[in-house]
């Protein structure tokens, strides 16, 4: 009797594509989030490079005074930037096909919107891809949660702030000096240095740097030597080894005596959670602060808070900051308006005659 064995029907093309996309054996994991991440980030990066090199000047304030941002129009690496979309466009969605010509699209700063929207989609998908890969490998999801902090910060300055201010022209320019200009104008208009959420962000970033340096130096100083004196201590580590590579008891004892006992972690898991949570929470708060100041819920104002018995103002640092803010405000967009809002709101004295 002869048995006939039929070959199992091969998986469909779509099935093989799905298996390849979700395979953790690839050198670089793609994932379903990666299907959207790759084209959006490639688009944002390509347009950024081309525009940074060759984009013509942009009428950022909508007053027919174009501002140059590209290298071919007189800028260098420090001064160059992708100039934000014109105030004449406001918050309108402005793809190339909405303009009468490519020249008009470039003049009104269309590349900025294109780059920012693709970039935000891309980094959000990168965060989703981190979660997806963690899920496939049976890991916990906290890598994606930590990455949500810079994603929130980027979304705040590139999307939420322009929405609150009513125009993409108020978004952060994509360049070094453009970033500093954004920071200075933000301080002038919103007094961000006096906002508690910004203070928490400063503590998060500087504190995170301090804790990272402390942790790295403590671990490096308490390695368990597996090599001779003639070899680097780093050569004594084998990838995937089960043994501890450093003596946490020695590190705990050192730091506990340097400061005091309870300033030092004796639990490695608690320590690493703290190292991750401190900067992440700080940056979350800063992003939240930017998002509230976008709608003009600004930093604290203690101007002229201290007076003497005669009612005369005794200047404090709050008043110094206020004068600096006014100076910065009158300098920016100097041709777009005659006076900044603070000065324009002052009642004009009446004259007889």
From Swiss-Prot:
According to the UniProt entry, what is the EC number of this protein? 1.10.3.9
Q: What positions does the entry give for chlorophyll a PD1 binding?
A: 198
The record's subcellular location field reads: Plastid, Chloroplast thylakoid membrane
* Prodomain positions: 345-353
Set out the biological process GO terms recorded for this chain's protein: photosynthetic electron transport in photosystem II; response to herbicide
Return the annotated site residues (Cleavage): 344-345
Q: Which residues carry this modification: Phosphothreonine?
A: 2
Cofactor note text: The D1/D2 heterodimer binds P680, chlorophylls that are the primary electron donor of PSII, and subsequent electron acceptors. It shares a non-heme iron and each subunit binds pheophytin, quinone, additional chlorophylls, carotenoids and lipids. D1 provides most of the ligands for the Mn4-Ca-O5 cluster of the oxygen-evolving complex (OEC). There is also a Cl(-1) ion associated with D1 and D2, which is required for oxygen evolution. The PSII complex binds additional chlorophylls, carotenoids and specific lipids.
Q: Sorted alphabetically, which Pfam families does this protein's record hold?
A: Photo_RC (PF00124)
Is Transmembrane helix set as a keyword in this record? yes
Which UniProt keyword terms apply here? Acetylation, Calcium, Chlorophyll, Chloroplast, Chromophore, Electron transport, Herbicide resistance, Iron, Magnesium, Manganese, Membrane, Metal-binding, Oxidoreductase, Phosphoprotein, Photosynthesis, Photosystem II, Plastid, Thylakoid, Transmembrane, Transmembrane helix, Transport
**What is known about its processing and modification?**
Tyr-161 forms a radical intermediate that is referred to as redox-active TyrZ, YZ or Y-Z. C-terminally processed by CTPA; processing is essential to allow assembly of the oxygen-evolving complex and thus photosynthetic growth.
Q: What is its main location?
A: plastid
Q: Where does pheophytin a bind?
A: 126
Q: Which residues bind [CaMn4O5] cluster?
A: 170, 189, 332-333, 342, 344
Membrane topology, record value: Multi-pass membrane protein
PTM N-acetylthreonine: list the residues. Answer: 2
User: So what does this one do?
Assistant: Photosystem II (PSII) is a light-driven water:plastoquinone oxidoreductase that uses light energy to abstract electrons from H(2)O, generating O(2) and a proton gradient subsequently used for ATP formation. It consists of a core antenna complex that captures photons, and an electron transfer chain that converts photonic excitation into a charge separation. The D1/D2 (PsbA/PsbD) reaction center heterodimer binds P680, the primary electron donor of PSII as well as several subsequent electron acceptors.
UniProt entry tagged with the keyword Acetylation: yes
Which residues of this protein are annotated with the site description Tyrosine radical intermediate?
161
- Give the protein name, as stated in the record: Photosystem II protein D1
Q: Which Gene3D superfamilies match?
A: Photosystem II protein D1-like
């Amino acid at each position: 009797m002869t048995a006939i064995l039929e070959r199992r029907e091969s998986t469909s093309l779509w099935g093989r594509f799905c298996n390849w996309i979700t395979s953790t054996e690839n050198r670089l994991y793609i994932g379903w989030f990666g299907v959207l991440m790759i084209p959006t980030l490639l688009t944002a990066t390509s347009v950024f490079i081309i525009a940074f090199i060759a984009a013509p000047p942009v009428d950022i304030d909508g007053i027919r005074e174009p501002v140059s941002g590209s290298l071919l129009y007189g800028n260098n690496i420090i001064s160059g930037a992708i100039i934000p979309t014109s105030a004449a466009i406001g918050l309108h969605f402005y793809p190339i096909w909405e303009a009468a010509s490519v020249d008009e699209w470039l003049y009104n700063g269309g590349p900025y919107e294109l780059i920012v929207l693709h970039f935000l989609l891309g980094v959000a998908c990168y965060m989703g891809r981190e979660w997806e890969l963690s899920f496939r490998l049976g890991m916990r999801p906290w890598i994606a949660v930590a990455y949500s902090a810079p994603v929130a910060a980027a979304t705040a300055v590139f999307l939420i702030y322009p929405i609150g201010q009513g125009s993409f022209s108020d978004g952060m320019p994509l360049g070094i000096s453009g970033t500093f200009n954004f920071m200075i104008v933000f301080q002038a208009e919103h007094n961000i240095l006096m906002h508690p959420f910004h203070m928490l962000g400063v503590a998060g970033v500087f504190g995170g740097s301090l804790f990272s340096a402390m942790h790295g130096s403590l671990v490096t100083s308490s390695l368990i030597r597996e090599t001779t004196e003639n070899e680097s201590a780093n050569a004594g580590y084998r990838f995937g080894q089960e043994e501890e590579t450093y003596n946490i008891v020695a590190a705990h004892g050192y730091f506990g005596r340097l400061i005091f006992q309870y300033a030092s972690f004796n639990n490695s898991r608690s320590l690493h959670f703290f190292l991750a949570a401190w900067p992440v929470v700080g940056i979350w708060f800063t992003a939240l602060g930017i998002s509230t100041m976008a709608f003009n819920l600004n930093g604290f104002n203690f101007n002229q808070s201290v007076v003497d018995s005669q009612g005369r103002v005794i200047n404090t640092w709050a008043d110094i900051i206020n004068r600096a803010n006014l100076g910065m405000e009158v300098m920016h967009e100097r041709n777009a308006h005659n006076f900044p809002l603070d000065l324009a709101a002052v009642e004009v004295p009446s004259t007889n005659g």
